[in-house]
Every structure is written in structure tokens, then in C-alpha cells.
Amino acid sequence: MITPETRPADSGDDPSTLARALEPVLIEACQGKLSDIEWFHADWQRGGAATGHAKWTENGNACPVIIKLPVGGIELSWTARLGDHGLDRDVRVGQTPHPTPRVFHSGAELGEYDLGWLVLESLEGKAVAGDLSASSVKGLIRAAAEFHARSIASRPDLGSPPATRDWAGIFARSRVSVKENRIPDSQRWNEAIRVVQKALPRMLARWEARPINTWCHGDLHPGNALHMPGDDGHPDRCVLIDLALIHAGHWVEDAVYLEHLFWGHQDRLFGIKPFSMLRKERKARGLDVGEQDTELANIKRVLLAAAVPRFIGVEGDQKYVAAALEKIETLMGQLSHL
């Protein structure tokens, strides 16, 4: 969230202290185009990043910017790679919005530190998480499709996906959690997980044979996108932020991840189906879609659903947990051919 609600940075906050100490070096690295920086702490921030407001002046034109440091290698590389485009504020109706922020400058070092940093266009939007509507959800999914298109165009060599998670271990702990946490419908849960465990080798064999056809965002949730409503000739649009978990994979991973966040609360999707809409948006952009997509999505849904008891208390509520159980019971029948 590039321009969220903020509070002044606490003087004892280590990232901000380091950022202030490095501010003169950062301004010098930007060749005098960056103004003095007002450091702040954003409500959405996780981890040890410092963030600041400033202005970037070039050819007599000043633009509000956000400075972020330190930035990890994956986020730095991809944000810079995809941020070489025009300003969001210049996008007009009829044009395709940029899926990620404009990057004015970036680097992997600052002074004597190996420390990644970014200077980004400041966006006047709200996080989709705090602005849920049909238009913001659609904008998020369109931005994901455009991200898929631009990322594969900029780096066609996908390489290998991350190693498969230890699903067998996760599901074993899920069964223990069902008992220890006295999860409602415990007998149904135990039976559902048992069925998944029995089919797991076949499901994983199918999953691991999936086509690797995109760079997945990896963390596609409403807190990682800004929504800018359309006005004054600008289109309604969303911009994705936090590109730290990008990885090679199959596009259904992003779709199902977003979808599963709303299990038990589908009303907050306003009738929008993330899998169906993302598939449609990818197809419209000439990106790979296939007949196996639904089956792969169902496998991913089952894997996530059977893991829910393992992470009880970390995410979800009773409606979410109940919906996850229903997913397993419904989808395992559809996957019985595996």
C-alpha cells in the first residue's frame, strides 16, 4: 500500500534509524533528484522495512514518491524489472493500467551496506482489503493477469518451481490439531483428511507434472493491491505491491490462493469467481490456459483445505474452517479418477 494511513516513525524503530542515517547517501545516489525524506510507519507494514515520503524532480517536473528500504532480492529485482513504465497518474480510459508501481530509481547497495532500496511512484489508492467492492476485486484480478503477461514477457525463461511442500507432514499435523483443538465436526474432518492422505501420492504426481507457465505473484491477497477508482478520465484499476514471493509455477496457484481467502465468506467476492475470471483475463491476453486447469485448481484447493486444521488459530474463522471441510468432501469425489 503505497500511500496508506500512516503514523510518524518511532525514534526507537531500528529500520527508520538506519534509513535516516543513510538518507544523505540515498539522496546522493539519486543524483540530487530526490528531496529530503519524511520517514513513516505504515499500518500494513510487516518486517523490518522503513518507508518514506519524498519528491522526485526531473526535467523540472516533480512527482511524489515513496522510498522503501531495505528490500529483499526478489522484490527488488522484480519491482525494478516491471516498473520501467509510465506514471499511473497518466493512465487514461482505454489504456491498459500498469500492474505494478513505476520505479524511478533502485539499487542493491547503499553506502557500505548490501541493502536493496526502491524509489516508487506514490499512488493515491486504498488497499483492496479495506475497500472491498466488485470493482476492486475485479481490478485486483485484472492486475494479476496483466502481471502474468508482463512478467513472462520480460523474463520468458521460467526455470523450476519451488520444491513441493511436505504435505504429508502437514496433513498428519492437521489430524492431530483436529483432536487437540476440538474442531467442530471432528469425525468428518478425520475422515476427510484420511481420504486426502490416501490419494496424496496420486494428487502430487499430477500436480508436479503441471505445466510451469507463469511467474506467480505468490501472495495475491487484498492487502497487496491498491485500488484507484476511475475518475477524471482515469480508469478504475488496481496496482499490485509486495513482489517478494514471485516464483515460477502454474497460474492457478494465484487464482486458488486468492479464492481460498474468502472460503466461508464468498459474499465478499460479490459473485466474482477468481479462477474463472483470471482464466478469462489470461486468455484475452494470449496467455496459456488449458483443459487441465480445473483439475489442477481442484487439487490445489484440496491441498489448502486439508491443511486448514494445521494452521488453526493463525488464519480463518469457523465459517472458513467449515467451508474448507466442504471443499474436501465435494472435490475428492471429482478427483476420484486420479
Describe the residue ranges of each PLM region.
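Conserved hydrophobic "DFG−1" position in protein kinase catalytic cores
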Residues: H53-W56, L69, H105, S122, ...
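A conserved alpha-helical element in kinase catalytic cores
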Residues: I66-L115, G130-A143
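A cross-family kinase active-site recognition segment
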Residues: P101, H105-G107, G130-E191, P211-N213, ...
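Conserved short submotifs of the Hanks-type protein kinase catalytic core
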Residues: Y113-K126
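Active-site activation/catalytic loop segments of kinase-like enzymes and analogous catalytic loops
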Residues: V252-L287, R301-T330
